[in-house]
């Protein structure tokens, strides 16, 4: 029994790849530095647009967690394509959008974690941990709890 528990802890500390797609270089660097400083076992990469992600994926790089902002996305089909190519990738929506309809749409596309850019560091790290350890779990920043009824239907 103890072996099972220790192996579970070890697997949650395995080096995983986090990709951040953020067009605002300053915000992207802040998020990247936050994760690197507090979760040094995670490998963090920063890109400016989602078009670049496909060359990484086709280059056989596993992307375990993807932070993105739908505002910077010109085509939501990219998210569906990312999930089709790599269904195990956990998607974290990190945005200023608080609209329930946007959250509902993203959830239907396979996004399970939602933070705002105003979220404090602890919330962002908690969302990262959930995506890392429980990839199919739903995580909502408390500022987005009004969206929860839409996602439970």
Predicted regions and their residues:
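C-terminal output helix
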Residues: 101, 119-128
């Amino acid at each position: 029994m103890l072996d099972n528990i220790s192996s579970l802890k070890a697997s949650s500390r395995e080096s995983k790849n986090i990709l951040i797609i953020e067009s605002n270089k300053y915000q992207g660097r802040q998020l990247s530095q936050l994760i690197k400083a507090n979760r040094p076992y995670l490998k963090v990469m920063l890109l400016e647009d989602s078009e670049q992600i496909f060359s990484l994926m086709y280059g056989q790089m596993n992307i375990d967690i993807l932070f993105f902002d739908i505002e910077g996305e010109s085509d939501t089909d990219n998210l569906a394509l990312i999930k089709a190519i790599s269904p195990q990738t956990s998607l974290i929506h990190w945005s200023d959008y608080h609209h329930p309809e946007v959250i509902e749409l993203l959830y239907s596309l396979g996004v399970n974690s939602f933070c705002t850019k105003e979220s404090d560091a602890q919330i962002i790290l908690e969302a990262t941990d959930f995506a890392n350890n429980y990839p199919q779990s739903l995580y909502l920043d408390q500022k987005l709890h009004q969206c929860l009824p839409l996602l439970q239907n």
